[in-house]
Amino acid sequence: MDAVLKSLSVRLPDAADKRSDTGRPERVTERPTRQEAEAAVRTLIRWAGDDPEREGLRETPQRVARAYEQIFGGYRQEPTHILDRVFEEVEGYGDIVLVRDIPFHSHCEHHMVPFIGRAHIAYYPRRGVVGLSKLARVVDAFARRLQTQETMTAQIADTIDAVLNPRGVAVMVEAEHLCMAMRGVQKAGVSTLTTQFTGVFKQDPHEQVRFLTLVRDQR
């Protein structure tokens, strides 16, 4: 039987918004021009102690600006739109859906240094399922911003919960933070793990154990 598609309409903070210290979005009122961004890179090169006009660095400001457009492309995405179509005809399936080992890279909002890792997402469908690739796209939409791992974990779970209205969502994120490896304490290879649960996963510890077991199975 052909799957039945349905579009969902849910209003969450716009992708052009940024978070305040409280976690609530704050409108970005003015975006600098590309020329201003490139000038800022030249200033940083000089501050680091090098000459932005030497041959190897002459085109670096343009390259950095182009790279940042891709690296921080999540600001131009609305994660709720990624999930706005569901397959309602799933032949009675109502058990857990798990997508694990979703690779991502993000940037620490404190030092603008990368943190790199994997996300694991599970949910119990209530009225339909989304394409599996959509969950990976939601991870990317939030990861490609200035972030903390804790906030990103909560954003992923809360968005899936708000849009799909499942019986529960579980998200685990594990990552290595280069700000910890390259500066400060300088401890490479240290992993940070964060989790966020909603619905049955939050209410029932056995469901949390099941999720964690499935994530770790055959590793």
Swiss-Prot record:
It catalyses: GTP + H2O = 7,8-dihydroneopterin 3'-triphosphate + formate + H(+). GO terms for molecular function: GTP binding; GTP cyclohydrolase I activity; zinc ion binding. Its EC number is 3.5.4.16. GO terms for biological process: one-carbon metabolic process; tetrahydrobiopterin biosynthetic process; tetrahydrofolate biosynthetic process. Zn(2+) binds at residues 108, 111, 179. Pfam families: GTP_cyclohydroI. GO terms for cellular component: cytoplasm. Belongs to the GTP cyclohydrolase I family. This is GTP cyclohydrolase 1. The lineage of its organism: Bacteria, Pseudomonadati, Pseudomonadota, Alphaproteobacteria, Hyphomicrobiales. The gene is folE.
